[in-house]
């Protein structure tokens, strides 16, 4: 069956933004094929009873197909929807969230239209790029071809902050000047493995993390001085040392080569210190819309205490603090709690406390000690809420739960479990990741009367 060619019509887009083609012997998922389009498809492989293929020849085009800005988006795989018009992307994401709830047998709900981005390009404040050589031996940067470790050379990524491109260009120039070789996975030789760049939307600050295969390297001080001279908006330069034979990008050890070990950015007027490994939402424009919607859904008042599970570096906690009497944030990652406390201090916020531990255990202990929380915010990782925390919510019955999710499937799964005692008041997708199949969602639940 592999490399066979078949003709079929796309009837839908999958959860991962692939075209869905129904044939007599099964379903074929096709990259870059959109609803209503007919194509000759080359089958690539079969997995778990489904076929996966690519467009060999497009027979009919959708009215929503557009010319992409990026010439390699079909090979890179990072922008699965860049050939789809932006209004059609928003419709897909709204439907994607609604479909997730239907799959979990949650009926009679209305998913609000996905909130659009004013800047669907050049929005990402974080980018990580491998450094390597092309077949001619030239130093290149870019992204791995989908499903491989072969670098597609890219000088401009259309969804990254444009400040990153200049910094990467100068890195490659300086590598030639200082005779620094890119890392070679086969021989495990060479110096530079990756470069990670974080940019601040509200301050002209950039953090660069250079991932190297060696601890020390010749000419390091002069290399750093020259890079900063050419790119003066670099406010923090970190060396991450990764000498392991691994696909994991970052090593355990880091040192600061220039500036502080953080940069500063802002959400809804609250400043945050961001270190190299901090989790911080990648779209600064859209995260403000997301948090405003979450705060609106919560309908907070100045007399209530709220609980923020999975609080990270305190973004939701600190953005909500001015609306309530007290906010308690809990996170299981020690470094994040340290950062959250620093962020409260630099903003002179005194009604936010941050506790290290399991969210369910801490919540239960605080309530047993007499604390009362009318609203709980949750913003878990992609895997969703822990069952233990869901059980705690059902047992302790806070009046409102505001759920921020990066995965509609786990959101719908968790809300199905919570529907034993909670009813859905609102579901709002937000397009945090234009040009990709990903979508962020905020849902508001209230305790049933």
Indicate where each model-derived feature is located.
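Terminal RNA-binding accessory module
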Residues: 1-68, 72, 353, 361
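Conserved "cap/hinge" positions at secondary-structure junctions
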Residues: 43-45, 131, 199
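Rossmann-like S-adenosyl-L-methionine
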Residues: 2-6, 15, 215, 219-449
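Short, acidic/hydrophobic/Gly-rich beta-strand patch recurrent on exposed beta strands
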Residues: 19-24, 142-145, 209-211, 340
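Extended interfacial segments that mediate partner engagement and assembly in macromolecular machines
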Residues: 56-68, 75-182, 202, 217
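Short, aliphatic-rich beta-strand segments
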Residues: 197, 203-213, 271-275
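Short, solvent-exposed loop/turn elements at beta->coil junctions and helix N-caps
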Residues: 112-120, 185-186, 193-194, 198, ...
């Amino acid at each position: 069956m592999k490399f066979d060619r078949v003709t079929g019509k796309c009837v839908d887009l999958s959860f991962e933004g692939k075209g869905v083609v129904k044939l007599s012997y099964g379903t074929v998922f096709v990259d870059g094929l959109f609803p209503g389009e007919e194509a000759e498809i080359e089958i690539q492989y079969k997995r778990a009873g489904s076929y996966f293929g690519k467009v060999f020849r497009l027979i009919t085009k959708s009215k929503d197909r557009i010319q992409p800005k990026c010439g390699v988006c079909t090979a890179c795989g990072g922008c699965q929807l860049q050939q789809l018009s932006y209004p059609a992307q928003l419709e897909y994401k709204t439907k994607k969230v609604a479909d997730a709830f239907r799959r979990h047998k949650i009926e009679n709900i209305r998913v609000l239209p996905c909130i659009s981005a004013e800047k669907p390009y050049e929005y990402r404040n974080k980018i990580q790029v491998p450094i390597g050589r092309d077949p001619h031996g030239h130093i290149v940067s870019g992204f791995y071809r989908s499903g491989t470790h072969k670098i597609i050379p890219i000088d401009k990524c259309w969804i990254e902050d444009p400040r990153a491109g200049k910094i990467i260009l100068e890195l490659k120039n300086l590598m030639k000047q200082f005779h620094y070789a890119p890392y070679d996975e086969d021989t495990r030789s060479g110096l530079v493995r990756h470069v990670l760049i974080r940019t601040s939307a509200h301050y002209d600050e950039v953090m660069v993390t250079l991932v190297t295969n060696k601890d020390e390297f010749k000419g390091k001080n002069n290399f750093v001085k020259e890079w900063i001279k050419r790119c003066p908006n670099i406010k923090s330069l970190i060396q991450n040392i990764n000498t392991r034979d691994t696909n994991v990008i970052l090593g355990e050890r880091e040192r600061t080569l220039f500036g502080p070990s953080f940069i500063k950015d802002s959400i809804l007027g609250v400043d945050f210190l961001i270190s190299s490994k901090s989790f911080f939402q990648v779209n600064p424009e859209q995260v403000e819309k997301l948090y405003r919607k979450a705060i609106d859904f919560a309908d907070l008042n100045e007399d209530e205490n709220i609980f923020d599970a999975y609080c990270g570096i305190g973004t939701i906690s600190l953005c909500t603090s001015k609306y309530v009497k007290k906010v308690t944030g809990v996170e299981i990652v020690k470094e994040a709690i340290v950062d959250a406390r620093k962020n409260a201090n630099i903003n002179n916020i005194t009604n936010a406390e941050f506790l290290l531990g399991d969210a369910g255990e801490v919540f239960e202990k605080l309530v047993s000690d007499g604390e009362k929380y009318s609203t709980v915010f949750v913003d878990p990782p992609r895997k969703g809420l822990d069952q233990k925390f869901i059980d705690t919510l059902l047992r302790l019955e806070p009046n409102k739960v505001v759920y921020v999710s990066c995965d509609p499937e786990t959101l719908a799964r968790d809300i199905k479990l919570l529907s034993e005692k909670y009813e859905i008041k609102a579901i709002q997708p937000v397009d945090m990741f234009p040009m990709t199949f990903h979508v962020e969602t905020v849902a508001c639940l209230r305790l049933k009367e």
